[in-house]
Design a protein with these regions (language model features):
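Juxtamembrane/interface alpha-helical elements of multi-pass membrane proteins
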Residues: 1-29, 127-216, 267, 271-278
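Intracellular alpha-helical coupling/juxtamembrane segments of multi-pass membrane proteins
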Residues: 4-7, 67-81, 166-172, 182, ...
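Short, well-structured alpha-helical segments that form the helix of a local strand-helix-strand
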Residues: 14-16, 36-40, 63, 67, ...
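Short, non-transmembrane cytosolic segments of multipass membrane proteins
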Residues: 22-59, 214-244
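Cytoplasmic juxtamembrane interface segments
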Residues: 23-33, 58-82, 197, 204-220
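Cytosolic juxtamembrane regions of integral membrane proteins
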Residues: 37-86, 242, 250, 257
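Bilayer-spanning, highly hydrophobic alpha-helical transmembrane segments
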Residues: 73-146, 261-303
Length: 303
């Protein structure tokens, strides 16, 4: 749709080319409805929710360009995290269920051949450790599901999560991406924070944006407000440099590009730690099972 608008086509022609129900849309337009309300009606995609907010403050073409930029950039971090974390979680679950299988099915049948409890004790300790970690992982997954699907829960828990440096970095990156995209659309700083305060779909960004905008309405200086917000410390440095240089857009872009690299590095370290731990436990399991499998042979040698 954006490509057609860039070619100078009128709205009616673009609607006829892009939508199956063009007649209904055109009829609703003739009845006085706003195009953006028609397009976003019943839509659940994040792009349309962003577009609906932006269209109130800029032209439809500008809003579409800005919404696409925000949507594409903000998806990068989440996609990287969830795609990278999936394999370590699989390895962890595989190791856990292997331990359960051997400790519940294989080991009891081998107990008759052994008087040594050391190997069994080690396996029991592994089972307890993995069970505790598995319960923690399930709880975290449930909390993540609630965080994504229950807006009220997300809104309540954000202030507590911001005490975590990794989450703080993640939210600050999202905020800087959106702010940079809005400033690049030639909006004033106050208008940008007003838009961010209306981004209810992005509760994290809304939390920051609404707080800043409300304090701006009270007459406080932006430089003072920024220092009171729990942003990533590096962001505060870049933001102040950008304000002094009068080129905040470029500085913000430099910041979030560096911050994304830092976030990916942290995620990769977490992934490597999980993989090493899971592989190590699988290795211990193999050694224990190997020792147990040798027990009947050892008994034959003693006869």
């Amino acid at each position: 749709m954006k490509l057609l608008l860039d070619q100078g086509l009128d709205t009616k022609t673009v609607i006829q080319l892009c939508f199956k129900e063009q007649d209904k849309i055109i009829t609703r337009l003739k009845n006085g409805e706003v195009l953006i309300d028609i397009l976003c009606d019943g839509q659940t995609l994040k792009l349309f929710k962003i577009l609906h907010v932006l269209a109130k403050h800029m032209s439809f073409k500008q809003a579409l360009t800005c919404a696409e930029r925000i949507d594409n950039s903000s998806n990068t971090i989440s996609y990287h995290f969830f795609t990278k974390i999936a394999y370590p979680i699989f390895i962890f679950c595989f190791a856990y269920f292997m331990i359960l299988f051997f400790s519940r099915s294989i080991i009891p049948s081998m107990m008759v051949y052994s008087n040594g409890e050391n190997s069994f004790l080690l396996l029991d300790l592994l089972e307890i450790l993995f069970t505790l970690l598995f319960i923690c992982m399930v709880v975290l997954l449930v909390l993540m599901f609630m965080y994504v699907k229950v807006p009220v829960f997300k809104e309540k828990i954000i202030p507590y999560l911001l005490k975590n440096k990794i989450y703080q970095l993640y939210v600050t990156i999202q905020f800087s991406i959106m702010l940079e995209s809005l400033l690049a659309s030639n909006l004033t700083s106050k208008s940008c924070f007003q838009i961010l305060s209306e981004m209810n779909y992005f509760k994290e960004v809304h939390y920051f944006g609404n707080r800043i905008y409300q304090e701006l309405l009270e007459g406080k200086r932006l430089e003072t407000i920024i220092n009171t917000i729990p942003f990533d410390k590096t962001f505060l440095v870049f933001f102040k440099i950008g304000m002094k240089s009068a080129d905040l857009v470029t500085i913000l872009k430099v910041y979030y590009e560096q911050a994304i690299k830092s976030f990916k590095t942290i995620v990769n370290k977490l992934i490597v730690t999980m993989q090493v731990f899971s592989y190590s436990c699988v290795g211990i399991l193999v050694l224990v099972v190997y020792q147990i499998m040798l027990l009947p042979l050892n008994m034959l040698n003693t006869i």
